């Protein structure tokens, strides 16, 4: 038992972090009563929920396009359909893996087994994530400005110092990983445009959910709040951001958006549900990926 805990201490710690975040979320909801939460869920418009689902699916296609552009520009002969299959399979698998990059590991494994260049695929996944983070960073001021307006000077100073350190680390990792694509600025620009499209539709998904419970907030405020929540979930203290994402979104929607705790928790939970639903095509594509892997192994024999 002790040996198992020693080998899996990071997973155990993340599991504890998720449980703690979910408990804190439950406490917030309990303060207003369970009835308020169920009432907020009943108020969600099916039409707006459907729109939110559709726009998130569109955002997934932009995310796939971002990675596909990087792969093709590096000389990997991969079809867009294969990129779709690998990405959705990774998204689906990430629901059951302990970190937010679990889906990337699945994508890399699948690409390698299908015979694509390992080094380029690994580098493309790193750059894919970095470009995604760069796009998110562009929307960060829309969340930081209203958040700092609520915070004390000491909190602002601490937050700025932490963000500055993160930014310096981000720039260093970016230049280390961009060796191939720095010579292909058009590919980098295309992937950045794709990630901006991905973000716009994610923000639109949250915007529609808010409309679905009768709240019309500024689109840019929604973008800022979601971006702040995104960066919080990158902290490796939970399983795939579970609990931490919901808790941070609940706090931001309550503090900056003016929603009640129950309404904020409803939106946060629905965001998680919609991401889960839109990952389900990965379950459909998984058999075809496995079949392609088996076919590749047979050909090599």
Residue ranges and their predicted role:
Residues 1-88, 136, 145-234, 259, ...:
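Predominantly cytoplasmic-facing regulatory/coupling regions of multi-pass membrane proteins
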Residues 72, 95, 112-113, 211-212, ...:
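Transmembrane helix-loop junction
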Residues 80-85, 99-104, 114-128, 259-270:
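Membrane-interface alpha-helices at helix entry/exit sites of multi-pass transporters
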Residues 90-99, 227-242, 246:
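Transmembrane alpha-helix interface/packing and boundary motifs in multi-pass membrane proteins
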Residues 96, 106-110, 122-125, 135-137, ...:
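Hydrophobic alpha-helical membrane segments of integral membrane proteins
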Residues 126-145:
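Hydrophobic alpha-helical transmembrane segments of ABC transporter permease domains
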